[in-house]
Curated annotation (Swiss-Prot):
This is Recombination protein RecR. Keywords: DNA damage, DNA recombination, DNA repair, Metal-binding, Zinc, Zinc-finger. It comes from Ruegeria sp. (strain TM1040) (Silicibacter sp.). Belongs to the RecR family. The gene is recR. A zinc finger (C4-type) spans 59-74.
Length: 199
């Protein structure tokens, strides 16, 4: 490192290293690239990040991320109200949308139940899910949770809460045990959604 004060650059590298998939070395390379491409990438990126910091918010209805209190998916009157797809986080919702197969509504839990991390039902959007099933005319809840231990524990808990109230299904073939939706290709997600099974 040169003798001049690079504290701002080092601070940016440290922040970038906190992003998923970036370690200290990749963050350093990314920051150096941003600096080299200041006008083309760094300045527009900084402007976009500033706008997102001001405008991004969680949809009050489903938990998706957007720039208004109710997201575009919830406002879309062409979507099927009877089907509600439950996912762990926004990345999973976006993965389902990329697959282009599901045309119903979504519900983002905001995580999974976890005894190790002391995350219980009240820490997630499970009470809101139960309320939506009761008030929105939902006929089927599709549990599109990751095939992890915490994901399956959460699915069983939700199934217990909604048992007898609504048809419950889960994604079938194509989602490997231990797999996460955000890492699957669109075809795999499509096949899994079409072959869902009742719980």
């Amino acid at each position: 490192m040169a003798a001049q004060d690079n504290s701002d650059i080092e601070a940016l590298i440290a922040l970038m290293a906190k992003l998923p998939g970036l370690g200290p070395r990749s963050a350093r390379r990314a920051v150096l690239h941003l600096i080299r491409k200041r006008a083309l990438v760094l300045t527009p990126l900084a402007d976009a990040m500033s706008r997102v910091a001001e405008t991004a918010r969680e949809c009050l209805n489903c938990g998706n991320v957007g720039t208004s209190d109710i997201c575009a998916l919830c406002e879309d009157e062409t979507r099927a109200n009877g089907e509600l797809c439950v996912v762990e986080d926004v990345a999973d919702l976006w993965a389902m949308e990329r697959a282009g197969v599901f045309k119903g509504r979504y519900h983002v839990l905001g995580g999974t139940l976890s005894a190790l991390d002391a995350i219980g039902p009240e820490d997630l959007r499970i009470p809101r899910l139960v309320d939506r099933v009761s008030t929105e005319g939902v006929s089927e809840v599709i549990l599109a949770l990751n095939a992890t231990i915490d994901g399956q524990t959460t699915a069983h808990y939700i199934a217990d809460q909604l048992s007898g109230r609504v048809k419950l299904t889960s994604l079938a073939q194509g989602v490997p045990i231990g797999g996460e939706l955000d890492y699957l290709d669109d075809g795999t997600i499509s096949a899994a959604l079409r072959a869902r099974k009742e719980i």
